[in-house]
Amino acid sequence: MKHVRLASACLFTLAACASSTGGPTVTSTTQNETFISGASQYDVSSKEQKDVMEQTILAPIDSAWRALPGVFLELDVEPGTVDQKTHVISNTSFVVRHTLGGAPLSRYVNCGSSISGPAANQMKVTLSLVVQVVASDSNGVSKLRSQVDGWGVDEAVSSSRVHCASTGGLEARIARMLNDEISHRTKKAVP
């Protein structure tokens, strides 16, 4: 079968479904490809959706931004990109095996399951983590937007990579850790 990529169109859509209660914003990517086999042509369109979780941080944007690198360090995730202008810290390609931040990886991503349990706990998983602090309409409060996505490979057998979707657990943990870090810093600053 001959594979011809005629068009690779990416369509990014941010749906307006993020709420003040921390609902997800959906980012969609659509890719169109054509496969040719003999005299037959197959047009395939695939769509991938990624949730962007938004959660409230009980501090102004500057305080939250200053505390965010400490959260990455505590999780043992090396920041790949730090953009002070847009308040984004990310690492879009880091490898994790079995656990992340002392917790089973399956708490944060779902890569399917095997006969011995959640596949994420048995695979080499490459994760993408993008976190942004944004201002909120409320005084003294900011918002944390985070997105987790990944791919896993079972190194014990020859296998294709599988998509590992976020469970929302890592996004929630990062928000809790950030609020805790800010609270700790505030208590230290008060005599």
Per-range role (PLM):
Residues M1-A7:
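Bacterial N-terminal signal peptides that target proteins for export
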Residues L14-A16:
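C-terminal motif of bacterial Sec signal peptides marking the signal peptidase cleavage site
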Residues A18-P191:
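Ser/Thr-rich, low-complexity intrinsically disordered terminal regions
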